[in-house]
From Swiss-Prot:
Superkingdom, natural source: Bacteria
PROSITE patterns: ABC_TRANSPORTER_1, ABC_TRANSPORTER_2, PHNC
CDD domains attached to this UniProt entry: ABC_PhnC_transporter (cd03256)
Organism this protein belongs to: Escherichia coli O6:K15:H31 (strain 536 / UPEC)
Catalytic function, reaction form: phosphonate(out) + ATP + H2O = phosphonate(in) + ADP + phosphate + H(+)
InterPro entries listed in its UniProt record: AAA+_ATPase (IPR003593), ABC_transporter-like_ATP-bd (IPR003439), ABC_transporter-like_CS (IPR017871), ABC_transpr_PhnC (IPR012693), MetN_ABC_transporter-like (IPR050086), P-loop_NTPase (IPR027417)
Gene from which the chain derives: phnC
Name recorded for this polypeptide: Phosphonates import ATP-binding protein PhnC
Lineage, top ranks: Bacteria, Pseudomonadati, Pseudomonadota, Gammaproteobacteria, Enterobacterales
């Protein structure tokens, strides 16, 4: 099975607090993987490293590859990092859309990386690009909102627009950082259904950070659980049982309670 993402010896320190400890991870083509863990476990930090939004510690000897290209090595971004990012759709918890633009215009932003610079200056997109954007919106059930300003949409609708933008980008990997954290249950279900659909039908590799264990078990065949910056569990979601859940979350809660008592 083809390895799409390779992480070796990744360590990260913030203000003398080590957020990640020598993390090793391989993710294969077509997988939908959930990164689980309590707050502060390092799951979002790990995800941001995968696209080079942040860099690891320079002394750790770390190396991250995505689609066969080096993203970063020993805390330094690769010179051709833009080529890696061009194939990676990143979905943020807070949507990261341009509120003053329409839904269609936000999706077209996904084509900027493959559009000549002079066209981007004037927002001149081709008819073919606009058709692809409408097709992406159709995939996520948002085509009827194409000409509506994105600021008028609900949180779940905005997240689906962000997914459509990744489709417009023709991303081969989607990294989704807490995409349902602020959504109601119905909106969360629709967003996760959408991610699973493009994973299964388009073969796009999806890595998603989640707090909600039930969604991870329902939608992802593989779970990578982090605990205090270490990989605590990496395996089938079917084998992530109550005992592992208890050790991952409740032991952390006991540590926090003891710290407060002290």
């Amino acid at each position: 099975m083809q390895t799409i993402i390779r992480v070796e010896k990744l360590a990260k320190t913030f203000n003398q607090h080590q957020a990640l400890h020598a993390v090793d991870l391989n993710i294969h083509h077509g997988e939908m993987v959930a990164l689980l863990g309590p707050s502060g476990s390092g799951k979002s930090t790990l995800l941001r490293h995968l696209s080079g939004l942040i860099t690891g510690d320079k002394s750790a000897g770390s190396h991250i590859e995505l689609l066969g290209r080096t993203v970063q090595r020993e805390g330094r971004l690769a010179r051709d990092i833009r080529k890696s990012r061009a194939n990676t759709g990143y979905i943020f918890q807070q949507f990261n859309l341009v509120n003053r633009l329409s839904v269609l215009e936000n999706v077209l932003i996904g084509a900027l990386g493959s559009t000549p610079f002079w066209r981007t200056c004037f927002s001149w997109f081709t008819r073919e690009q606009k058709q692809r954007a409408l097709q992406a919106l159709t995939r996520v059930g948002m085509v009827h909102f194409a000409h509506q300003r994105v600021s008028t949409l609900s949180g779940g609708q905005q997240q689906r627009v962000a997914i459509a933008r990744a489709l417009m980008q023709q991303a081969k990997v989607i990294l989704a950082d807490e995409p349902i954290a602020s959504l109601d249950p119905e909106s969360a279900r629709i967003v996760m259904d959408t991610l699973r659909d493009i994973n299964q039908n388009d073969g796009i590799t999806v890595v998603v950070t989640l707090h909600q264990v039930d969604y991870a078990l329902r939608y992802c065949e593989r779970i990578v659980a982090l605990r205090q910056g270490h990989v605590f569990y990496d395996g089938s979601s079917q084998q992530f049982d109550n005992e592992r859940f208890d050790h991952l979350y409740r032991s952390i809660n006991r540590v926090e309670e003891n710290a407060k008592a002290a």
